[in-house]
Amino acid sequence: MSSSQSVPAMSSRERVLSALARKPVDRTPVCNPTSVATVELMDLVDAPFPEANRNPELMARLAATSYTELGFDSIMPVFSIIQESSALGCSIQWEQKDNWPTVRMGDPIWEDADDIKIPPDYLTHPDTKCVLGAISRLKKEYGDEVAIIGKTMGPWSLGYHCFGVEPFLLLSLDDPEKTKLALDRMKEATVQFGLAQIEAGADALTLPDHATGDLVSGEYYKRFLRDLHIELAERIPIPLILHICGRTVDRMDYIAQTGFAAFHFDS
């Protein structure tokens, strides 16, 4: 990506997508691929948590403040990381206005790779359907002006949510092959939700997969996730922004091999 005075003026959408494609831009885009939700913005547009996580109109209204109030070049309506897990059957702690919802990982739904099943109503569950509805609304209202970024959770994150963090990490130590099988099955939830968001109007997707430095090593990333992430980049045909929290220096070389458009290293 480079900025040049010779590049004609771009819309916010053109600017973000050109940057993700490593093409010249008229100026450096300002893009938040995770969430801009704050209590102040909720109050400003009357779209508070937890309702803004479950109502597509409120979700879209709050997300739009990224563009209308903050002047960013992107809108990202998925404020949490629970939608897929909720649709898969996990219990959710919805919290109040000043906190985001979380998965109750102490109450896992799966113990073995053979337990993994994607429900037939996965994409029509209220929490996944809400995201699709919000993206569709945003695309209709802002789609020509600003980049609409969705979010689909990676299989390692889904493993934490659906197996529990400690059981999933222990499984990776005790039975790496069964862990790979579990990841292979869970990735279908990632792909299905990602493709549905593209159909709804998403221009790019954030893909959080929390193989964080405090829990797994760079070699773990290479062993379990690099090739799987390469596959996701091939199967989901819009720019993907990988997110991993925390210190990730030891896996950057592997992440660079995936074909993802960008890497979001903390939030």
PLM region descriptions:
Residues 2-35, 40, 49, 73, ...:
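Active-site loop segments of alpha/beta catalytic cores
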Residues 37-38, 42-70:
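Active-site-flanking structural segment that lines cofactor/substrate pockets
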Residues 42, 85-89, 138:
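Pocket-flanking alpha-helical
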Residues 52, 87-102, 157-171:
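Aromatic- and acidic-residue-enriched segments that line the glycan-binding/catalytic groove
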Residues 59-66, 105-111, 178-182, 236-239:
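Short C-terminal domain-edge/linker segments immediately following a structured domain
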Residues 62-92:
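Glycine-rich, N-terminal phosphate-binding loop and its surrounding beta-alpha-beta segment
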Residues 80-121, 145:
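A contiguous, low-structure linker/loop signature
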